[in-house]
Amino acid sequence: MKDFLEDYKKSVSERGSEGIPPLPLNAKQVQAVVEILTKDPTNAAFAKELLIHRVSPGVDEGAKVKAEFLAKLSQKKLECVHISALEATTLLGTMLGGYNVEPLIMGLESQDKNIAKESAKALKTTLLVYGSFDKIAAMSKTNALAKEVLESWANAEWFLNKEPLNECIEACVFKIDGETNTDDLSPASDAFTRSDIPLHAKAMLKNRIENYEQRIKAIKTKGVPVAYVGDVVGTGSSRKSATNSIMWHFGKDIPFVPNKRSGGIVIGGVIAPIFFATCEDSGALPIVADVKDLKEGDLIKIYPYKGEITLNDKVVSTFKLEPETLLDEVRASGRIPLIIGRGLTNKARKFLGLGESEAFKKPSAPKSDAKGYTLAQKIVGHACGVKGILPGTYCEPKVTTVGSQDTTGAMTRDEVKELASLKFDAPFVLQSFCHTAAYPKPSDVSLHATLPGFITQRGGVALHPGDGVIHTWLNRMGLPDTLGTGGDSHTRFPLGISFPAGSGLVAFAAVTGTMPLNMPESVLVRFKGEMNPGITLRDLVNAIPYYAIKKGLLTVEKKGKINVFNGRILEIEGLPDIKMEQAFELSDASAERSAAACVVRLNKEPMIEYLKSNIKLIDEMIASGYEDKETLKKRRDAMQAWVDNPVLLEPDSNAQYAAVIEIDVAEITEPILACPNDPDDVATLSEVLADTTGKRPHAIDEVFIGSCMTNIGHFRAFGEIVKNAPPSQARLWVVPPSKMDEQELINEGYYAIFGAAGARTEVPGCSLCMGNQARVRDNAVVFSTSTRNFDNRMGRGAKVYLGSAELGAACALLGRIPTKEEYMNLVSEKLESQKDKIYRYMNFNLMENFRL
């Protein structure tokens, strides 16, 4: 006990010097607190405060110890002079759900009427009861308090007893001009601290603005709530840590939940869809409104019901809150609590024979004259058990596949615990370790050791560090025409559809097997024509924003930004026979368009080929000891069932789209690349070389071939171009996306070629793409095959081009961006005659002696 007190007070002092609270108590520490309460009266008052306020709720390991102790006190099996049986019952009611539910149900039958009543009172506000609902329902036939609990749930007292949003909210503006991406709010270099919300929040905006700590501190002294304001807010990764950081600085404490806050206000001219949804989930108020007349330090009034923002009693901006349920979401402390609570209310009403509740705002049916459905609308409809879902419709589709990666996995674990879940209802949940495998910090090593068991115990599947990028694996676990999600913005399945999300919603989807969705509109991109020699799929990826800019549907400028893709589904057709790995290049890059999701219309044949390969992969995973075996077997069987009867959904010919962009690939006669530092700022090779402003530098310092945007064909092509050439003029990084790609490239001799070229190779994984481990040199000019090129992402001050591996090879050879002629000559000489050999994909079922 003495050691615990000394260690804890030391931790309080150390973290206090950084302006942050101590970490929540772990199970061992909670056990020490319990011992102090029962054996050390001198420190009991301090220990009681820790037990009440410093233990995470739900099914956290510490919560189990806390609940067991309080249950013994409530049931009078143990006495503690500092906590009465009645107070213990009250404290059980603060733990949200999980380990506290069973003791509270038992309390309904207590001989002590006060404890029985207090148990009922606690259960009325406990939403995370899951299977225990049936137990309470059965009890209600003979137990008046159990019936009272059901009636309270049915009447939505848990919701109606919360204060609605005020008619007028006074706030002080904290404004970041231009675009704030999630890497600004949650720097990748600090990814290892993300689950420690207060510590991670200290890094918010450190790479974006000078004197960031002073600015944040100063704005909080105004004595009113702070509104985070920007022209474009939340683009980029799906990391919930970005939202967590804003809420830690500007939100409100959550009673009895340590080191976490909710609430907060975000106002943006454009708010990226994943970030917007994460704000909804977390109880924040996201508002899309013109912000040009708002300046830092302005004391504004926000009228959420009228949709006005005033400054000095003058209206400076107007808005309409969307979705319609947003006010309910804020009142319920978030969209996820609202969905869970609303479901509990409906379940109780159904059991009691009551009609639908009138307590909640009902989403209006969309007004549409649409006669048909797009492919995306049909896939979502299929997940909802209907023919299709029109834009504007609120729905809760079934989630078939869920992904979690390591830099968000610890947060997802915490969210699963808070949801009081011991089992996943989603059919397939995959956890990877791709962002931290190469250079793990001590916290990463701990995560690698503890997170796999947490996932597999709940029926999920855990990969190993070094296996490779999550998307390379998760794509192979998908099923045609099904819906999924994942805690990474590049969760963009090439078959079916996926809506990436923050870790809170990912946890919800994994736990419940469903996710909330306000169905977006779709933008159709239709390719036609024949590709010219030397043109790659990556050029088609960059052609999408290139042609959108031509049509006035996309602007690079952030102020008053136009982006037709933002928050919509990108639907792609016209390339029906490309391989699944190629289709993923297209769907993956929809993240950089800020699209909500993407679907690629393909024929059956590439899907059948892909699934046959994936069935073999799963067989080898089972043979190699990957867990959970039953989950893997079920997914393998589902794949085989589809291969045996391959039927695909098709869009209706009269489906309606928000916009249609037609791209004749025959018009593309040279590579298209994204320029520093904006994935929307695309230009042809000739346009880049014609730029003499210095904004598009021509000399290349470093080249990166890797990320989820690559497949084995890219590495072969790169190898063939640099083979037998002098060592690269640029610093060269080569990192395959999976250990299967790595082994095959070694077998084929390409690693020898990479070594001769002077390449630095790493274990399969994300490598430079996220910039959370190894980074390029400060101020380097980089050519990369990775996903995005935000400021400071790959390296401080780095200027990053995005394009194909083939163009990257030319840059590596020359140490500069080649001319169109130089590039075409290289491709023609090195690749054209052996394209079929180079661009072969990983069909494991056809590979002799394939083993993991």
Curated annotation (Swiss-Prot):
**According to its UniProt record, which reaction does this protein catalyse?**
citrate = D-threo-isocitrate; (2S,3R)-3-hydroxybutane-1,2,3-tricarboxylate = 2-methyl-cis-aconitate + H2O
- Describe which pathway this protein belongs to, using the record's wording: Carbohydrate metabolism; tricarboxylic acid cycle; isocitrate from oxaloacetate: step 2/2; Organic acid metabolism; propanoate degradation
- What's a single GO MF annotation on this record? aconitate hydratase activity
Keyword annotations for this protein?
A: 4Fe-4S, Iron, Iron-sulfur, Lyase, Metal-binding, RNA-binding, Tricarboxylic acid cycle
Q: Which residues bind substrate?
A: 194, 237-239, 405-407, 489, 788, 793
Gene Ontology CC: cytosol
Q: Which CDD domains match?
A: AcnB, AcnB_Swivel
Q: Which cofactor does it need?
A: [4Fe-4S] cluster
- Which superkingdom, per the lineage? Bacteria
The enzyme class is lyase
A Gene Ontology biological process in which this protein takes part is: tricarboxylic acid cycle
Q: What is its EC number?
A: 4.2.1.3, 4.2.1.99
Binding residues for [4Fe-4S] cluster: 708, 766, 769
> What remark does the entry make about the cofactor?
Binds 1 [4Fe-4S] cluster per subunit.
Q: What Pfam families does the annotation carry?
A: Aconitase (PF00330), Aconitase_2_N (PF06434), Aconitase_B_N (PF11791)
Matches recorded under NCBIfam families: acnB, PRK09238.1
Please give the function described in this protein's UniProt entry: Involved in the catabolism of short chain fatty acids (SCFA) via the tricarboxylic acid (TCA)(acetyl degradation route) and probably via the 2-methylcitrate cycle I (propionate degradation route). Catalyzes the reversible isomerization of citrate to isocitrate via cis-aconitate. Catalyzes the hydration of 2-methyl-cis-aconitate to yield (2R,3S)-2-methylisocitrate. The apo form of AcnB functions as a RNA-binding regulatory protein.
- Assembly information from the UniProt record: Monomer.
Q: Which family does it belong to?
A: Belongs to the aconitase/IPM isomerase family.
Designated name of the protein: Aconitate hydratase B
Q: Which organism is it from?
A: Helicobacter pylori (strain ATCC 700392 / 26695) (Campylobacter pylori)
> What taxonomic ancestry is recorded?
Bacteria, Pseudomonadati, Campylobacterota, Epsilonproteobacteria, Campylobacterales
